Amino acid sequence: MYYGGYYGMYWDPTYILVLIGMVICLLASARVKSTYAKFNRVRSHSGITAAEAAEKILHGAGIYDVEIRHISGDLTDNYDPSNRVLNLSDATFRSSSVAAIGVAAHECGHAIQDAESYAPLKIRGAIVPVVNFGATISWPLILIGIVLGGSHTLIMLGVLLFSLTVIFQLVTLPVEFNASSRALKILGNSHILYDDEISGARKVLTAAALTYVAAAASSILQLLRLLLLFGGRRDD
């Protein structure tokens, strides 16, 4: 049973950690949107679209079995390694802006990682099923543990499963930073973007990478909160 210092399901001082995480994520999201909007107005001198740039980058890397698809949404661009599909959003696919080409090159970076069996990408892909399971069941276990009178075993099992999300987000960081590094190098070497345009693409990709840093920081703060609330408690 829980005792001493338990604040219940309502407000407690550790919520400040959650609020800090939310603010960090909101600031990162606002920055990537404003940075993308700024460089989305800057047209590349080459005049090619992001989709054309993606095809050129993939072929230049000797990759011909990745399909480039147009999907709905803004900044929903992604690379799907299970189906070997590079998805470019409405804001990216037909755009010839520095921002759009930078984003497309970043996703190509993931495709190249996949082709080269880049270890962090493979590790991230391997743990996805376990992480998804943990994310689904962690909070229900914590809540059930509280409802049952403060079962330390159930609650800490929930906390352990939640920690898998933190691990996933930490593994994601080198994957994203490496993809951006590859993208910028390729854009320069292939002359898809000129030197002055590379600077804009770098700012867009850096802002995007910071959203992953913010998400990881937010999850770490949430995990810290759970450990502060429940880590020192025991079942009777």
Model-predicted segments: where are they?
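Membrane-interfacial helix-loop-helix connectors in multipass membrane proteins
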Residues: 2, 145-160, 229-236
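Post-HExxH zinc-binding segment in Zn-dependent metallohydrolases
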Residues: 128-151
